[in-house]
Every structure is written in C-alpha cells, then in structure tokens.
C-alpha cells in the first residue's frame, strides 16, 4: 500500500471515529474491525456504534427527514452538520469521495435504512435497502483497493490534516 493511500485510509478512519464520539451518543463508543485480503488486493473496514443513529441525530436539525435512507443520503453531502453556528459536515462526504476515487465500495446502515455505493466497474451504483430489523446505531463498511495509487485530498483549503 502506498504512503498516500495509507494516509487517506487513516484520515477516513479518523473521520468516522470522530463522528462516533461527537454525534452518536453511544456510551460504549464503537467497534472497529478490519481485514486485508492480499489476493484480492483490498482492505475491508467496518465501524459500528450503538448510538442513536443518523436519522435520530439529523432529524433534530433537519425536521423534513422522513426515513433512515434519506438521513444516510443527507449525511454524505458536504456541509451537512448538526452543530449550530459551527462549520463542519465534511467527514462522510470526504470519505465517500475517497472511496469513489479509489473505485471502492461503501455502505452505511442505520435504523431501517441501508445505502450501498459501488464505484467499481463502469457505472457507479447506489443501492437502497430497507432493513426488516432496524439497528439503532450506525454501521459503516468500507472496501478499499490497495493496488491503486489513488489519494484523496481534502478539497476545503481551510481543512488541515496535521
């Protein structure tokens, strides 16, 4: 794995972990699992928290939300934040863009909604699923291609990595 890709992966994990501790309300924090698949040249990363979920947290500020799937789609848009009077809302949008540049996959499951982005192949696919057994927290799965030299840099010039 290149140093640049390793840095992008660390940044993505840091953003997800920051979201857990800043927004989830989980008393237990989160669980993180990762595995490298050498033959397929991919890394799979999963972060799960048992907090209030995206729909509950975002509904506090965005009262027009109707369901968990809408909350997921809103959460990955740049500038969407629950903080009042503060800039933010770049974490999940940057992660989604990194996965797009990497031609990887990302899924977010929260409440009764699940969204899956598949950037591999010729077409980008966003798939919606409704879960029969709702999950109160949030689960984020990333599949990263380690054979690519793709590096995603933050677009906002005010963002600092170091």
Where are these regions (language model features)?
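Alpha-helix N-cap/helix-initiation sites
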Residues: 2-6, 85-88
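Conserved ATP-binding N-box helix of the HATPase_c
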Residues: 3-38, 93-96
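Short, function-defining helix-loop hinge/capping sites that tune catalysis or transport
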Residues: 27, 56-57, 99
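Short beta-strand element(s) in the Bergerat
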Residues: 41-45, 138
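Acidic ATP/Mg2+-coordinating residue in the GHKL
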Residues: 49
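A short glycine-centered beta->alpha linker in the GHKL/HATPase_c
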Residues: 53-64
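Flexible, glycine-/charge-rich segments associated with ATP-binding catalytic modules
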Residues: 62-66, 77-162
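ATPase catalytic-site recognition across NTP-hydrolyzing enzymes
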Residues: 69-73
């Amino acid at each position: 794995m290149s140093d640049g890709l390793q840095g992008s992966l660390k940044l993505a994990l840091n953003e997800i972990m920051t979201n857990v501790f800043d927004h989830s309300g989980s008393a237990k924090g989160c669980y993180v699992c990762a595995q490298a698949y050498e033959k397929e040249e991919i890394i799979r990363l999963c972060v799960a928290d048992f907090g209030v979920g995206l729909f509950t947290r975002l509904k506090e500020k965005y009262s027009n939300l109707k369901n968990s799937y809408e909350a997921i789609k809103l959460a990955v848009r740049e500038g969407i934040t629950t903080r009042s009077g503060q800039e933010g809302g770049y974490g999940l949008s940057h992660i989604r863009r990194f996965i797009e540049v990497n031609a990887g996959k990302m899924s977010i499951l929260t409440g009764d909604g699940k969204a899956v982005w598949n950037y591999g192949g010729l077409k980008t696919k966003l798939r919606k699923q409704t879960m029969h057994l709702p999950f109160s927290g949030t689960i984020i799965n990333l599949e990263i291609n380690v054979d690519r030299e793709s590096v995603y840099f933050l677009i906002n010039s005010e963002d600092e990595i170091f």
